Amino acid sequence: MIRYAEFCTGIGGFTLGIARSELDAEMVYCNEIDDSCEKTYEVNFSRKFDSKDIFGIEADKLPDFDMMCAGFPCQPFSQAGKGLGFSDSRGTVLFKLVEIIKAKRPAIVFFENVPNLVRHNKGDTYQFLIDSLNENGYSVFDKILDSSYFGVPQSRPRVYIVAFKKSVFGDHKMVFTDKKTKQTGLRNFLNYGDYSIPISEKWEEYIDLYTKKKSINDISFELPKTRRSLERIAPNCDLNDCIFQIRSSGIRAYSLDDPFPTFAVSNSGGGAMIPVLSKERRHLNLTEMKRIMGFPEEFVFPVSRTDSIKQLANAVCPPVIESICNDLNAIAKGILT
């Protein structure tokens, strides 16, 4: 059995994906500083975090583990965020993770982050991670995978990094299953029978204008300057039967037959980018947002709606983790198990 430790655990995207996979694995440690995430994690997995700040962890006091997992904070490296990298305290979590790797020398390192991590600071940030792993005896493999090819109705590209300790795996290479099946559209994942969350009244007139006019040009000067940046993504999109994403810069429209773009929270507040169904004039409900992220309907959120949405938007996508762990199982079976 593979013993694994999870850092920056969030609400358990890694935990859930690993549990669903063929990998014979047991969690021996998990860490997360967010109290709200801990409540959600505990009620779903009957387990408490080590909730101390990751920078306060003494690596030599951690239990031994074969695999280290982390979906470390993406905001410092994200194009949607400020991209401050190591100037953001959350970005320096990467240094701590490398420190733990050096101390514990797990056989497998498994990380997830935004694709922009690879390009951040002209590639220097990512090169630091690769060099650190190489210098400590690891072979590093990575792949950008989009969740919409894994049965999730959301286009959520992420870079997945797997490193093998050479002294354990020798010349074995990680092969990611890159599923190029049809992307998953959103329409069949909507839950029309569930409760509805009305949109804010201040947006009603904007949505009305948007659906009554034929083109963006027809309405661009009818909206305030801060809402003029309108983008109709799908050329065949029916504005009376689509999904809107209300952003600080304006409104974007997407076809329900396509995957929804990356679900995220705004830097200015938890609900600013919650998707809106044009036909029903409502936000997506929590059941639908769980489906967008690949979480099961029975997954419980014992926290406020705002916190629930934020937790989902920051989560790791379990179906992709499950697929990668199945790939890992094919290699690790007979070596670690």
Task: Walk through the language-model features, giving the residues of each.
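Conserved SAM/SAH-binding beta-strand->alpha-helix loop
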Residues: 34
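C-terminal target-recognition/interaction regions appended to catalytic cores
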Residues: 210-337
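Conserved proline-anchored active-site loop of SAM-dependent methyltransferases
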Residues: 4-13, 18, 54, 64-81, ...
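A short, Lys/Arg-enriched amphipathic alpha-helix followed by its capping loop at the start of a domain
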Residues: 17-26, 44
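Conserved SAM-binding strand-loop segment of SAM-dependent methyltransferases
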Residues: 47-53
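Conserved SAM-binding loop
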Residues: 41
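The conserved SAM/SAH-binding core of class I Rossmann-like methyltransferase domains
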Residues: 31
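Class I S-adenosyl-L-methionine
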Residues: 57-67, 77-255
